[in-house]
Amino acid sequence: IVQNTSGPKEANDFWSRAELNLLMALIHYVVNLRDADGNLLPIEQRGLGDVYRMIATESIEEINRKLEALPPEHPAKYPHGLFLKAKENLWGNIVIGLGNRLAVFQSRLVDKITRNHDVDLLLPGKRPCVYFVIISAQDSAYRFLSSLFFSLALPQLSNFARLQCAGGRLPVLTNFCLDEYCNIGYLDGVADSLNSIRGFNMSAQIVVQSLSQWQEKYPGKEWENQLATFDQTLYMGCNDLTSAKYISEKCGKVTISVLNNQMPMMPLFSPVYSSTRPYSQTRSNTQRDLMNPDEVLRLENRKCLVLFKGHKPALLYKMTPEELPDYA
């Protein structure tokens, strides 16, 4: 939540860390709410919307009193203790900052989605089914919801396969088609999940508009670590030089034969020029990129490049679904 509601330079600053500690404390508090008999409240009464309502309707003094009254072994105590280490005159600003991050829970629909426990994240690994996660490409306010879905689904399915399935593999192949990947939201630690999902009978496809967009979303080596987990790369076309240079380098070098012709030219009506050099022709071998970046950029729309691990690149023709014989 904090990562997907932060700017490029905010994710690791003081305010974000302080808000994260308070958020963790409140989540642990709400998740473990019990009735007078000591039983956990229904799941519908222990949602993220309740966290937002606490910070929106209660003073920081009331919140602190509730958290301080918890037993020492309660999981909310440690993050709350870290929050209290901030100066007291900063507490109000931290609460306001966290409230702004959770403002999306003012929407009843968002509150309903996160409050009800009716999405079985393990179902795709048990029987064939399809989950569609549809979000706006223009409005980023709800992106952390889609990032929460995938951040929970990947490790939960992996743990289910490892601990409860025969041979450590899901009985049904589970595929993640992550179209418009950079608009899903930031997925923390996704490279580690992608590294191991094959062994659990899972697969994934990441679709991005350009590498520069991917690099902006996952700076440093993050995007490269994610890309390295895939064995096939399909290039459909691009308009940015970063992607073109990357594809050009991935295609590798080829050896070409160069033919040089030399023919002496005698100036007309020149009494002083004479040449005894004969006509000559030389052949040599040199290297060049299989496809230069400008050639990658100019690739015809009806063609695509496929890069396979351990094999030479393939230049193929695209086919629309309507061209398939069995398309209905």
Roles of regions detected by a PLM:
Residues 1-202, 217-218, 228, 286-318, ...:
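P-loop NTPase motor domains
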Residues 194-196, 200-305:
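Conserved ATP-driven motor cores of ASCE-family P-loop NTPases powering translocation/secretion/packaging/pilus
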